[in-house]
């Protein structure tokens, strides 16, 4: 654990804390823009959106549990469900840590394929 922490801190020092925050802001915005382009709605108001995780409202007719299963089994991507009263109302995409722009692009492409399989008729081409 101590070695892993040392490696993580070295990586942070190398990138620089300001650059880390900029990267997270860029990835958060990229995720939100991509999700909206697919015809989905962001759960949080734009001014309150997180740069570490994006919560997406599950559209009517979409089985959120099935969507998460498809993403994991067919694309190797884990989406988190909502918690407590939001369990069946949202799913979450994490983009904190060592996440790249290419990984966000892959996630969005996979989501575009998986959504219709889970009942979403509104995927934009």
List the model feature ranges, each with a label.
Residues 11-17, 33-44, 60, 64-65:
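PLP-dependent aminotransferase class I/II
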Residues 12, 53-55, 92-97:
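Short glycine-rich or small-residue beta-strand-to-loop segments that form or flank ligand, phosphate
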Residues 25, 41-74:
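Conserved PLP-binding catalytic core of the aspartate aminotransferase-like
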Residues 75-89:
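Short glycine/proline-rich, acidic loop/turn segments that cap or connect secondary-structure elements
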Residues 1-29:
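Structural signature of PLP-dependent enzymes
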Residues 72-79, 112-118:
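A common structural junction motif
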Residues 16-23, 37-46, 82-83, 119-125:
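Flexible, glycine/charged-enriched surface loops at secondary-structure junctions
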Residues 85, 89-125:
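PLP-dependent enzyme catalytic core of the Aspartate aminotransferase-like
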């Amino acid at each position: 654990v101590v070695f892993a922490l040392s490696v993580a801190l070295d990586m942070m020092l190398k990138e620089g804390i300001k650059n880390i925050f900029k990267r997270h802001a860029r990835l958060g915005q990229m995720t939100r823009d991509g999700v909206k382009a697919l015809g989905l709605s962001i759960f949080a108001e734009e001014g309150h959106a997180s740069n570490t995780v994006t919560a997406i409202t599950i559209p009517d007719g979409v089985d959120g549990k099935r969507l998460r299963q498809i993403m994991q089994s067919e694309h190797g991507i884990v989406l988190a469900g909502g918690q407590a009263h939001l369990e069946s109302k949202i799913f979450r995409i994490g983009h904190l840590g060592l996440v790249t722009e290419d990984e966000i692009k892959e996630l969005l492409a996979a989501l575009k394929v998986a959504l219709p399989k889970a009942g979403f008729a509104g995927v934009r081409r």
